[in-house]
Amino acid sequence: MKAAGIDIGTTTISGVVLEKEENGQAKILEAKTVENGCFIETGNEWERIQYAKEIVERAVNLLDYFLEKYPHVERIGLTGQMHGIVYVDKEGNCVSPLYTWQDARGSIYAGDQIPLTEEIRERCQIHAASGYGLVTHIYNIRHNLVPDSALSFCTIMDYFGMYLTGRKKPLVHVSNAAGFGFFDSHKMCFEKEKLAEMGVDTNWLPDVCTEIEKLGTYRGRTVTTAIGDNQASFLGAAGDEENILLVNMGTGGQISVLSGQYFSGDGIEARRFGIYDLCR
């Protein structure tokens, strides 16, 4: 069985085709990386946004290249940069740029006002960094930056899955949902009361799944829900092995280890991954 994977990163978009051998191991048939190159120049030093539609176009071209060369691919897996969001309308169309995880609108000092991230920490007792999707969304609500036609939001790789399959409503894996902030990784749900306190209409929240599910099909191949890039890198490098440290250096960097129980502490984040991927 052959499968293709697409990783939409901040600076590059990568893909791979794997074949499962008789011994159960995966053999890499081909890997390919192209530049993302879709950042939008704005007049705001704190703003880090990208052309979402151009990113998807480049990702589709890469995927189509693989499907033409390896026609027996049966499944398509997705991953990519976490935390950032795009807005979608009722038809599942993207109606905004990608507000990336590097965006700093949540950390802006405006006169005597404290930054949004500090307000969230004081009012909700939640640590949510600038660049987290719901921090971005709250800022956009307050500054009338949410597109009029938007009804929900998701990550760029979730939107890519919607684009491929024609899905109209986002379905987000828990590994990506947690990256938006305001998410209880122990109970596996958004903290809706705290979001409502911050002025968020919780009807905008995307649907969340705890397992990798089928989104639909693209050119006759099954497309599954995207997972977070941290979880995907751990899966690819360490599988489900415990007592292994994974050092991942991309645009950002993390050290991760698998844990059978939920744990939180200063500088440590528990990210759901079947069990827990503890990331620092």
What are these language model-derived features?
Residues 80, 102, 212:
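Residues that line or immediately flank small-molecule/substrate-binding pockets and catalytic motifs
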Residues 8-10, 121-230:
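Gly/Ser/Thr-rich active-site cleft segment
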Residues 114-120:
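Conserved FAD-binding subdomain of flavin-dependent enzymes
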Residues 61-69, 139-143, 237:
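A generic secondary-structure signal
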Residues 85-90, 94-111, 150, 154-190, ...:
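Glycine-rich phosphate-binding loop of actin/hexokinase-like ATP-binding domains
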Residues 1-96, 122, 149, 206-207, ...:
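N-terminal glycine/serine-rich phosphate-binding loop of ATP-dependent small-molecule kinases
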Residues 76, 103, 140:
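Residue-level signal for inorganic ion chemistry
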Residues 55, 59, 106, 133, ...:
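Conserved donor sugar-nucleotide recognition element shared by glycan-biosynthetic enzymes
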